[in-house]
């Protein structure tokens, strides 16, 4: 039985390059020529590996999530729910305004999915965002069980609050807001956090996820 020709490129490296293209140009704005040029592969290789532009974008989103896994792990590992909120929003401010030049400002999940046309991409993006929200909700439900949050606290609403704030931070970053400005926004959002009475920001604000 014949097997296909072995892949002649590193899939993860190619996806990392595709991330930058989709992030800067959006799904509709990224042409196949742009993508293959950035990824260093030819169109047949792209189609053989990913099936279509839509298939490539879905793989890009999975890769983007994979790169952020350690960040979400550090968020939910914070010892208190107030520190969970702080780690999350300050971390988002950090990577949304990435000054290293590795990534465009903002968030791929928001900018990359603009003007997707008649595809399943909006549903896929919604699923990815819902997964992040579910991680936060689970952490807050655990805090309720441990007695850190009141029994009538709405874990889902708290998770949604953080997601809404983080989306706003990313939009502002894409519009040109500086890291300092985004941290100020995050700090204000944290003053409204219902579980952080008397909480003082303590995190190293120079930290941002890779």
Language-model features: locations:
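Amphipathic alpha-helical packing segments from all-alpha helical-bundle domains
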Residues: 119-146, 157
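Hydrophobic alpha-helical connector segments
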Residues: 59, 73-105, 155-162
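N-terminal intrinsically disordered/low-complexity leader segments
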Residues: 1-9, 153, 199-210
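Helix-turn-helix
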Residues: 2, 13, 17, 21-55, ...
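An amphipathic alpha-helix signature
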Residues: 15, 86, 133, 137-141, ...
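Short, basic, alpha-helical segments at the C-terminal edge of helix-turn-helix-like DNA-binding modules
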Residues: 62-68
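Short helix-capping/turn signature of helix-turn-helix
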Residues: 50, 111-118
């Amino acid at each position: 039985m014949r097997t296909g020709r072995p892949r002649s490129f590193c899939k993860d490296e190619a996806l990392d390059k595709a991330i930058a293209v989709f992030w800067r140009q959006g799904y509709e704005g990224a042409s196949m020529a742009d993508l293959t040029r950035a990824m260093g592969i030819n169109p047949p290789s792209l189609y053989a590996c990913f099936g279509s532009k839509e298939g490539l974008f879905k793989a890009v989103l999975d890769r983007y999530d994979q790169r952020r896994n350690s960040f979400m792990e550090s968020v939910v590992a914070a010892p208190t729910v107030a520190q969970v909120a702080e780690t999350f929003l300050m971390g988002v401010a950090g990577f949304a305004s990435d000054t290293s030049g590795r990534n465009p400002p903002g968030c791929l999940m928001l900018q990359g999915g603009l003007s997707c046309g008649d595809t399943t991409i909006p549903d896929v993006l919604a699923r990815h965002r819902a997964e992040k929200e579910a991680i936060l909700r689970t952490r807050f439900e655990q805090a309720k069980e441990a007695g850190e949050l009141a029994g009538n606290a709405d874990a889902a609403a708290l998770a949604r609050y953080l997601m809404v704030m983080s989306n706003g931070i990313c939009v502002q970053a894409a519009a040109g807001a500086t890291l300092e400005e985004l941290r100020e926004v995050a700090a204000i959002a944290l003053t409204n956090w219902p579980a952080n009475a008397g909480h003082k920001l303590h995190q190293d604000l120079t930290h941002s996820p890779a």
